[in-house]
Amino acid sequence: MARILITSAIPYINGIKHLGNLVGSQLPADLYARYMRGRGHEVMFICATDEHGTPAELAAAKAGKPVEDYCAEMHEVQKEIAAGFRLSFDHFGRSSSARNHRLTQHFAGALAENGFIEEVVERQFFSVADNRFLPDRYIEGTCPNCGYDKARGDQCENCTKQLDPTDLIDPRSAISGSTELELRETKHLYLRQRALKDEIEAWIDSKTDWPVLTTSIAKKWLHDGEGLQDRGITRDLKWGVPVRKGSEPWPGMEGKVFYVWFDAPIEYIAGTAEWADANGKTDADWERWWRTDRGAEDVRYVQFMGKDNVPFHTLSFPATIMGSREPWKLVDYIKSFNYLNYDGGQFSTSQGRGVFMDQALSILPADYWRWWLLSHAPENSDSEFTWENFQSSVNKDLADVLGNLVSRVTKFCRSKFGETVPAGGSPGEREHQLVAELQQRLAAYEACMEAMEVRKAASELRALWVAGNEYLQSAAPWTVVKTDPEQAQAMIRLALNLIRLYAVISRPFIPDAAASMMTSLGCEDWSWPADVGRALEVLPAGHGFTTPEVLFRKITDEERAEWQTRFSGVRS
């Protein structure tokens, strides 16, 4: 049994996330966590809300609420929606937790002690209208790289280029919109990433199995232009982790907080500590996942994120870990994703464009969305959500293939043999061929899941469903029963066991449907099918079942057209 630590990029607190956020981090992370648990491994799956920085302050101000209250409310909203999508976090934490405050301050102190923090006097925009310094995300303007007119002072969300506020063309305050900005002096802490460049580069070079998307972005940031730069890790904000050197005050840094991108990844560790606190466990219980001197040396750590988060996870967070000179666990594998677009444009939380997670669940249950998003995950390139494709995929894959098999088998058995697994007959050559095909396809499915090739895994799972349907079409028990009822019973006995097999292996993708299939079969045996032949004998003759309701209903053309109009791309 392996020990797998899984973290998903933590979503910003500023509103409900869209489907692009979901498929770029949390959902594939959940798929992998569910699969690894299903294979019997020990899994720790951590996520949280990212509650500090400009987005939280601006969103709270817009909502007319104190930022602490806003974050507490939105954490519960995001937690509830995550549960609605059946995201199986072991803990869904908060970056504003006391644990994260202490750990962030601890890392800053360790970095300073080791000479990797520099105090820098810099010139920063001061808004005369707002009477305050403006951190980078409080400044908007036109991106000098791509011309996008809503670029932020830290990064352009359109082209992902990292920016300095002074790079922006026609900068303005994100608070008031005022262009009356002055450059004034202020002092901040910088993480000396350049001093750690050789260590970081050697570490990245050692990760020969990483996706091309991950390594290409990391190496681009390492080498393009002037290469890896030192990074400011403090801001002139009120809301955040107060700047301290470990447990001690930091002279000259009074009233400042740590930059959100410094404290947010540390929440992966803090969130695991929060899990221990919430479950009455000790520090040793979470440290065995994170400290290589306390049991984490055999842990495999996998991160999931969108491509815009890759630089922070391949450069800045590793620099924090390495520079601490403490035995913390570094990530082993980073699975990154491209963007999911919406009807010819980009999803965007800040711009309110696209279908959002709460809206999606108000239309259809989670499994419909999970299946489409995972089977169309933007792994090798950007992908696009269209209502036509969504309807086609749901109707063909879920309703016509899997749902149809479950319905035909259970209803036929009920009508001919009652709601018990029939006892007659024995497997023939056709059944043996099916078992061999399923064994081969299952191995391919497992290989894709192990490699985190999400779209290929979905394709292999669908092929497993198709194999069962093709067997039924070929065997035709509804015809055989007229001349050889014993053989028809053997076919249906195998087919009922096939439903259980599909429930077990489909659970990572469609957990609710899997649970429904198992409930109908009156079975609680979720053991992974190492041997398909034996797996197709788990339900014995005489075992009772109930004929389920429709597993997946089809989406009508009228519904598709109505949703297309209703969700035209802008959230009110």
UniProtKB/Swiss-Prot annotation:
This is Methionine--tRNA ligase. It is found in: Cytoplasm. A motif ('HIGH' region) lies at residues 11-21. It comes from Cereibacter sphaeroides (strain ATCC 17029 / ATH 2.4.9) (Rhodobacter sphaeroides). Its cofactor is Zn(2+). ATP binds at T349. The keyword GTP-binding does not apply. One of its GO terms (molecular function) is ATP binding. Its main location: cytoplasm. Is required not only for elongation of protein synthesis but also for the initiation of all mRNA translation through initiator tRNA(fMet) aminoacylation. A motif ('KMSKS' region) lies at residues 346-350. Zn(2+) binds at C143, C146, C156, C159. It catalyses: tRNA(Met) + L-methionine + ATP = L-methionyl-tRNA(Met) + AMP + diphosphate. GO terms for cellular component: aminoacyl-tRNA synthetase multienzyme complex; cytosol. Keywords: Aminoacyl-tRNA synthetase, ATP-binding, Cytoplasm, Ligase, Metal-binding, Nucleotide-binding, Protein biosynthesis, Zinc. One of its GO terms (biological process) is methionyl-tRNA aminoacylation. InterPro entries: Anticodon_Met, Met-tRNA_ligase_1, Met-tRNA_synth, Methionyl/Leucyl_tRNA_Synth, MetRS_core, MetRS_Zn, Rossmann-like_a/b/a_fold, tRNAsynth_Ia_anticodon-bd. Its EC number is 6.1.1.10. It is an enzyme of class 6 (ligase). The keyword Isomerase does not apply. The lineage of its organism: Bacteria, Pseudomonadati, Pseudomonadota, Alphaproteobacteria, Rhodobacterales. Binds 1 zinc ion per subunit. Belongs to the class-I aminoacyl-tRNA synthetase family. MetG type 1 subfamily. Pfam families: Anticodon_3, tRNA-synt_1g. Monomer.
